[in-house]
Amino acid sequence: MGRIPRVWYGNAYSRSGGLTDYNRFRSYSDVIGPMPAASVADPHFFWLGPTSNYEVRSAWYGDAQGTDPNFEAPSKWRQNIGLDIITKKGYDFTVEYNKDETSEGVFYKDLGLTQTGSLADGRGTYSGAGDFWLTNTNKGQAEAITFIMKKAFGDVQFMTAYTNMNSDDVYPLTSAQAESAYGYTQRWDGENLNASRSSFMVEHKFLATLDYTRQIIGNNDTRFSLVFVRKAGEPYSVSFDEPGYNSVTGNSRFYADYSLAYIPTGATDPNVVFASSDVANAVMAHVNSTGLSAYKGSHAPRNAFNSPWYSRLDLRITQDIGVFDDHKFIVYLDLLNLLNMIDDEKGIVREYSYNNSRQIMVSGVSDSGQFLISGVDPDDNLWIQNNDGQSAWNINFGFKYQF
């Protein structure tokens, strides 16, 4: 796999504990004045120096981050095998299988993590210092198998393919900072993390292309190209919607709303206390009508579910216009996401933000460790994703000169 983002190494230097005078000084602080040459009371730079007159952060902020001296850059063992077959009738088949096994993966530990007790479902309660340690894990794997078929039918070129993928990892690692990479990870019990379905895998993907070329205007090629894609949605987790900034475990280093939800067995489940009978009925109706029912009395693993499937159809029309010799203009028209152009309810990507859905609402835990369930939000955090225009139709027109 090779390199990792350098900022992951940089955390140990920028957050080394009391060596740094600067620690997120805020403009509301009446103790710390502006740094030299700073025009505001909340400077966004680091000021280092053992002779500094500025206040060093208190012990509460004295977390320190480090890197395991035996840390190895991520690596995997990779195997693949492929088979190509061309039949007498012109069918071109390809089958390819890939298998990855993690040799050295990335793992974050809080060296100050301490278990303080247990909750009703068996998960621990914790306190943490935020002394994050960059180290390795050998957990994780990925495998994929792809089938491809190609065939020419006169002026028509046809291709279809299918890929099935299964990929597991420990941390999604979507953040540059150790604390957020650690905190924004769905978990059941502290750092007892197993490899789970990756947030980035596409379990099923179908692809089909159709290409038709005909000389409609003189000896100039007119080409129609269709591309159809249908794929499974991203994996996501079902978590508690937690109050405040702490998880139900009591540890602020595990970010709120990222605790995997306990799934009640029914209205009389001894591990939970429902706010009312109406809340109990609503929660259990949701559980019994979804895949959560398979996990009653426990929790659904990280990324156990999938967002809705997505389909897309694109069309490109190109027209050659000969000029002289081998010189020609190529005019093209792209109709992107035709399904959405025809029906604005089609061709839409719906995903759970950060692969997380806070469906079971809790107000806290009881003195005996029961979860205080206050409600249910069946489609929490489900959004239409359109940052790159993937949920909207598009028309592009252009030309190029080829010689």
In which residue ranges do the predicted regions lie?
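Hydrophobic, lipid-facing positions within transmembrane beta-strands of outer-membrane proteins
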Residues: 67, 77-81, 143-147, 204-210, ...
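Gram-negative outer-membrane beta-barrel transporters
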Residues: 96-237
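Solvent-exposed loop/turn elements at secondary-structure boundaries
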Residues: 1-133, 253, 271, 292, ...
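Outer-envelope beta-barrel architecture signal
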Residues: 7, 79, 89-91, 154-156, ...
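Outer-membrane beta-barrel strand-turn architecture
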Residues: 5, 85-89, 141, 152-155, ...
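Extracytoplasmic gating/loop element in the C-terminal half of outer-membrane beta-barrel translocons
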Residues: 223-324, 357-383
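Membrane-embedded beta-strand positions of outer-membrane beta-barrel proteins
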Residues: 1, 83, 93-95, 149, ...
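C-terminal beta-signal and terminal closure region of outer-membrane beta-barrel proteins
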Residues: 125, 305, 343-403
